[in-house]
Amino acid sequence: RGVKVDFDLYPYLTGSTQLVHLLPPQFQEGGTDAICARLADPFCRKEITKVLKQPSDIFENIVELAGFDMIYASTLHTEKFGSFAGQSIAKIAEQFGQDPYDTLYDILLEERCQVTMLDTIASEEDMLYFLKDGRANLISDAIYPAGGKYHPRVYGAFPKLLTAYVRDKKIFSIEDAVYKMTAKPAQVLGFPLGTLEKGMPADINVFHLDQLSVHADFQNPNQYCTGF
């Protein structure tokens, strides 16, 4: 009570994080070696699966919320799994003829937890609701994995906000959008950035709203936009 609350979001319904974050928090403790030791233990696997099959108000159970059909391993590097990058856990499991929970654990163990993922659990209705909230900070939340496929938000977050939600859908004004991308998050974090004032850093970005176009997508995410 009494604490100022803000939040941030980016304009995609698909999220991205590390695949290891699918595990319940208590099974992530101790670092990579400890996690891999648990994943190599059949009893621990059963305990993890038992937790993941239940809704939780203690942690964000993405497996239960999204399902393995909507969880994709976006970066895979080992000989065993490298060719499956970009496929869903369910699809990979099908090709190995095994339960998707075991496929998840096998991937994490083989790749030593160095895997990024994509998942879809939001809706456009959710997006519009939060975009209109005055507490929203507009961000990219970019993760730069070593190889594999980035989330298109890395290259497309800000131009998509400006094209889809300012120019096309007119959810908010260009002034409000730029403020939520620059000065507002800077103020929340206490950084002297984001405004055109004497003595401030000259980090100025010029763009043509009518000419803005987003080229990054999930198949070809590493594409610059045009118009900036």
List the predicted regions and their residue ranges:
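Active-site neighborhoods of metal-dependent hydrolases
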Residues: 1-170
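Divalent metal-coordination and catalytic microenvironments
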Residues: 8, 97, 141, 177, ...
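C-terminal cap of metal-dependent C-N hydrolases
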Residues: 41, 129-135, 140-141, 205-228
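Short, well-structured alpha-helical segments that form the helix of a local strand-helix-strand
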Residues: 101-108, 174-182, 200
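A short structural micro-motif
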Residues: 110-114, 183-188
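Flexible, glycine/threonine-enriched loop-and-boundary segments that flank and lead into catalytic domains
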Residues: 116-125, 187-195, 214-220
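Feature captures the catalytic cores and cofactor-binding loops of soluble hydro-lyases/lyases
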Residues: 159-171, 180, 209-220
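Histidine- and aromatic-rich ligand-binding microenvironments
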Residues: 193-196, 201-204, 208-210
